[in-house]
Amino acid sequence: GILFMFAASLTFSLMNACVKLLDSMSSMELIFFRHVFTAICIGIWWCFYPPYKTDSKPRKKGGYLRLLMRSLTGGLAMLAMFYNIATISLGTASAFAQTMPIYIVLFTLLFTKERVRLPIILATMIGFVGVICICDIRTESLGIDNIIAGIINGIMMALAYMSLKDLKEYFNESSMIMGFAITMAVVGGVFMFIEIPPLSGFSMPNVREWIGILILGILGTLGQMFLTRAFILAPAGLISPLDYMRIVWGVIFGVMLGDSLPNMMTLSGITLIIVSGVLIAMPVFLQDYKKYKNKSLKP
């Protein structure tokens, strides 16, 4: 499970690097082609393994409006992330994307009756300090638009993640991925022809861009497969902290593609976000580790 989570983190980071290389294409174009490829892959998978045959768990009827809302929030998160990847350093864009746990804790405090312990609240405050650090507008490449996109990215990813718990009662995983892919392919296909600078716009891809689109689709699909496999093989709390490797990979691949090294303020912010995320995940990590250890010791 840990190896698959590591592979998922690396694969998604490579996908983000591919997005940066395709900065000549609009974010809407990338969303359209990325999700058309995913829908085709899931469709081929369903030809061999139909969901009604492989899913033995009883499901509730309906849930389509919830699936649509989850798809739209996840799509907005991806749109904001793609925009930042194209316009700022890959490491900073990756750090914004990994602020999701901070907003989950905040929404849990504000909108649910779940009890949040003081250490988690303190970890969340550390994360917000990290966000403030990477929102340093004194850096030449980071503008107000990037800060807004980064905040939207984290908030929308948190909302999309929190909706998964309810959606599992209605759909299996492949159906949720297909619903998300179809929704975002339609949204991307429509809005790339509507003038919304700098997000929209369409130009026929050249040979290099078609190759990039193909690699983007393959990496995205592989990343989703590795991530799913990781959560099947190991408890979520045990492997979730490894997802923060995406920030490290983002900095490495960004520098390889020409980004400058993060300044001290940005590096401090990235470090605080990683520390915050690991601290937020720590109680679940320890709980799952004990269960996993006890299970492995049983004869």
Predicted regions and their residues:
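Transmembrane alpha-helices of multi-pass small-molecule transport proteins
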Residues: 26-76, 156-160, 179-196, 275
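Hydrophobic/small/kink-forming positions within alpha-helical transmembrane segments
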Residues: 9-13, 43, 71-79, 101-106, ...
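C-terminal transmembrane-helix exit sites in multi-pass transporters
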Residues: 101-122, 248-267
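Hydrophobic transmembrane alpha-helices of multi-pass small-molecule transport proteins
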Residues: 119-136, 265-284
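Helix-helix packing/entry segments at the starts of transmembrane helices
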Residues: 94-99, 167-183, 224-255
